[in-house]
């Protein structure tokens, strides 16, 4: 059984005395604890120092969640506290590490890059919304490149403004490891040059199962993604939403998707696929792949009549087929209004018929009798 030590969230830890009960629990269960969760707290420097001493005693620790730990802390405090907490993980077989939602930026990279250089057992690394920027991303990637034995399966580095420089650095990591199964790097302002490098590096990771690269500039580099997709035989999930790929590449993308045996989920929202004929081709390609379970095409101004034509078949064969977001409400309202108008017409026809019958009856009455 996996023993999880979970510290209550939304607490501001400044007084070391407040840690006594927590430290006692850690010490008593040091041989049982496998996972340690400290997320959604606010840790001061002295508390981080004392807590790190207790964490270092845990014998079989493999999973660590340090997400969202420094709310309201000064930027001078954060690197010191983080370094204490990361030092406690050295010489352990850590396979999962989450440092997301800590806005430390490049200034705090030296507080944990030493761990990345030495963590040979690390498989899952989550660094979301850390304010890394291009420089911070490069520093993280350089540390990973110095670790010859690391074989990451998961990298989540979303919302970090990697831009081209950060993407080029990350591509070197992906190309070297060849072990990745899950990649998330959405909302990073990456240019086409950076995305081309990422796609070519992804090609080296034959076991990749999930790719989420939405909200980056991939319109001018998506052909490289389309070219490598047939080689990613384990791929199950792909999200290229908010990338403005347009009709031409939208069709080419789904044409390739239609031939992938393992693909199950495709997200292609808000991509300016607005041509009715192009949408029809895409719907046909979706139907050709019997393994797909979920398709999202929201925000592409899907033609209403076309949607009605394919809706029944899609919903019978897919777990989810979603083409409308805010437009969906308008679509449903139009349907309701059309229904109301039809009802009004039927009521009017019924009343007209009743009026005609009444008039006939009146005409048949002999007023002279």
Segments (PLM) and residue ranges:
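Leucine-rich tandem repeat or coiled-coil scaffolds
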Residues: 1-369
């Amino acid at each position: 059984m996996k023993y999880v030590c979970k510290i209550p969230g939304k607490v501001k830890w400044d007084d070391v005395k407040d840690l006594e009960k927590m430290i006692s629990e850690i010490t008593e269960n040091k041989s049982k604890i496998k996972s340690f969760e400290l997320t959604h707290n606010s840790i001061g420097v002295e508390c981080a120092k004392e807590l790190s001493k207790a964490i270092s005693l845990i014998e079989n620790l493999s999973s660590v969640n340090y997400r969202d730990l420094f709310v309201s802390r000064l930027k001078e405090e954060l690197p010191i506290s983080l370094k204490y907490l990361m030092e406690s993980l050295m010489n352990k077989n850590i396979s999962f590490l989450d440092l997301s939602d800590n806005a430390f930026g490049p200034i705090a990279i030296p507080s944990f890059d030493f761990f990345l250089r030495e963590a040979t057992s690390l498989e899952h690394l989550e660094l979301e919304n850390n304010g890394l920027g291009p420089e911070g991303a490069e520093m993280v990637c350089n540390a990973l490149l110095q670790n010859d034995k690391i074989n990451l399966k998961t990298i989540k580095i979303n919302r970090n403004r990697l831009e081209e420089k950060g993407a080029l650095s990350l591509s070197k990591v992906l190309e070297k490891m060849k072990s990745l199964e899950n990649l998330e790097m959405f909302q990073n302002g990456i240019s086409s040059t950076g995305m081309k490098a990422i796609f070519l590096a992804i090609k080296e990771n034959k076991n990749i199962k999930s790719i989420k690269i939405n909200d980056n500039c991939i319109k001018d580099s998506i052909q490289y993604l389309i070219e490598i997709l047939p080689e990613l035989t384990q791929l199950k999930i792909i999200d290229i939403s908010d990338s403005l790929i347009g009709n031409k590449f939208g069709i080419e993308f789904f044409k390739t998707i239609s031939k992938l045996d393992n693909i199950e989920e495709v997200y292609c929202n808000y991509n300016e696929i607005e041509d009715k004929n192009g949408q029809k081709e895409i719907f046909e390609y979706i139907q050709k792949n019997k393994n797909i379970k979920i398709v999202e095409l929201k925000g592409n101004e899907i033609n209403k009549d076309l949607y009605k034509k394919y809706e029944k078949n899609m919903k019978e064969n897919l777990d989810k087929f979603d083409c409308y977001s805010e437009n969906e409400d308008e679509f449903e309202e139009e349907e309701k209004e059309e229904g109301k108008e039809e009802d009004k017409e039927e009521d009017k026809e019924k009343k007209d018929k009743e009026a005609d019958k009444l008039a006939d009856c009146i005409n048949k009455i002999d007023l002279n009798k």
